[in-house]
Amino acid sequence: MVRLPLKCLLWGCFLTAVHPEPPTSCKENQYPTNSRCCNLCPPGQKLVNHCTEVTETECLPCSSSEFLATWNREKHCHQHKYCDPNLGLQVQREGTSKTDTTCVCSEGHHCTNSACESCTLHSLCFPGLGVKQMATEVSDTICEPCPVGFFSNVSSASEKCQPWTSCESKGLVEQRAGTNKTDVVCGFQSRMRALVVIPITLGILFAVLLVFLCIRKVTKEQETKALHPKTERQDPVETIDLEDFPDSTAPVQETLHWCQPVTQEDGKESRISVQERE
């Protein structure tokens, strides 16, 4: 029973000798190794050899296409990011031994994700639609329909809806109304149209005036008849004075129209018409 604790003690001493415990803590920018604290390699350099009892940590600068941004004990530097133009990327800032290359989307493109590993073209607003919000490096174009009085006749990622042209302000007349895709068409007023409209207008005015005069005349005649009623016309009676004629008792020979004598019968009075006497 005494030998078991002794064996455990011996094994503990053996393991401690083979794997010595590192120091409990190292200074800032140091790392523990082989029971000692070694300095970390500064930004822009990579680790070549750990420190020993007689040497310091051995570091080597990164190549021109590599970088390390922090204090480290890395054996290899990181490659600079490649801004692939086929993905719509371009270099915003070249990388150094301490910093990585910064990529941004080229003109007319925006990032497809938060890491901006690739870019895509801005969406276009087609005719009838205008740009409500322009695209940025991380967001796409937002379009909106053109309201009444505005139009857009192009496909664009930057053009807003434009107002219709005011023909009146230019002294012109509207020949064709605008739509959400087309502008108003203005032009000069046609002379031929004026030559047609003017006579028609004058004719209408003349007709109205003529009707007015006729109505006025009829109304005036009716008023006159009402004030002065018309009296019934009587034919004059012709009177004949009998004194101008001889005594009707005297025998008179009657004649006909053809001057032929007519024999008066006894006992009948002679009747001569007023016309024959005249």
Curated annotation (Swiss-Prot):
The chain crosses the membrane at residues 195-215. Residues 21-194 are extracellular. The lineage of its organism: Eukaryota, Metazoa, Chordata, Craniata, Vertebrata. This is Tumor necrosis factor receptor superfamily member 5. It comes from the Eukaryota. It is found in: Membrane. Disulfide bonds join 26-37, 38-51, 41-59, 62-77, 83-103, 105-119, 111-116, 125-143. Its main location: membrane. It comes from Sus scrofa (Pig). The keyword Cytoplasm does not apply. Keywords: Disulfide bond, Glycoprotein, Immunity, Membrane, Receptor, Repeat, Signal, Transmembrane, Transmembrane helix. SMART domains: TNFR. InterPro entries: TNFR/NGFR_Cys_rich_reg (IPR001368), TNFR_5 (IPR020435), TNFRSF5 (IPR052135), TNFRSF5_N (IPR034021). Receptor for TNFSF5/CD40LG. Transduces TRAF6- and MAP3K8-mediated signals that activate ERK in macrophages and B cells, leading to induction of immunoglobulin secretion. One of its GO terms (molecular function) is ubiquitin protein ligase binding. Monomer and homodimer. Interacts with TRAF1, TRAF2, TRAF3, TRAF5 and TRAF6. Interacts with TRAF6 and MAP3K8; the interaction is required for ERK activation. It is a single-pass type I membrane protein.
